[in-house]
Amino acid sequence: MRNDYLCAINQTTMTAFDFFNIIRSIPKTLRFNLHYFPLKTALKLPVVVSHRTYLRELHGKVELPEKVETAMVKIGFGDVGHYDRKRSRGIWQVSGTVSFGGKASIGHGSKISVRGNLCLSDGFNMTAESTIVCAKEIRFGRDCLLSWDILVMDTDEHPIYRHETNRHETRDSGSVPSPEVLRPASNDMENERINPDKAILVGDHVWVGCKCVLLKGTQVPNNTVVAAGTLLASAFSGEHQVIGGNPPTVLKHDIRWEH
């Protein structure tokens, strides 16, 4: 099992630094696998966890495909040159469900916070220092690549409720409204939330550039590139395109991209 673990986690030439970090990752890797999976599955070590990943909340559940391989999911590894991976710390905070559809890599310094349903299909790769906050549902299709310093969040975290006031009287008077004017129109309106969580759906073979923000309600179709620094909060259609700008629009059509 030890040799399988070392070979699977590094298919390239291993430096002394890499080897040392892999050995240090064994305790957290064992803890993660034994917590989430049956013993037979856990002993295959399908998920490897860097010692620099803070396992803040090991609740909820983690789902794997039927065919399980050693180190098919890597959390907290990689080496993006403009970050210091020696001090780059990730966080795993899960009380919901995380589903891995195959091989996946969550790079060093990345934060995963899930109380809803997060689905990462085969070939998912998040390079470094990015954050996923899932309160409802976030889905990534096959072969998705996320660059560094990205935020994916399907919630506003804090609820906002409707508060009806007599705006007509306030505008006309030009004075500070009295408490009677500001009172809600009804208890039903007072309890109506106006910012519910909304799912984020990302298709197959999507590349999200660095410093992008994907907020609730985002839908990205297959074979799309999201340009660096773009903020998305709505649904797009079409394929083989580049989306970018603020507000975002389709910048180019009929493109394809490769890793």
Region annotations inferred by a language model:
Residues 2-153, 159, 169-182, 186-187, ...:
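Domain-scale signature associated with acetyltransferase and cell-envelope carbohydrate enzymes
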Residues 232-233:
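Short hydrophobic beta-strand element within catalytic cores of glycosyltransferases
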Residues 225:
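Cys/His-clustered metal-coordination modules, chiefly Zn-binding fingers
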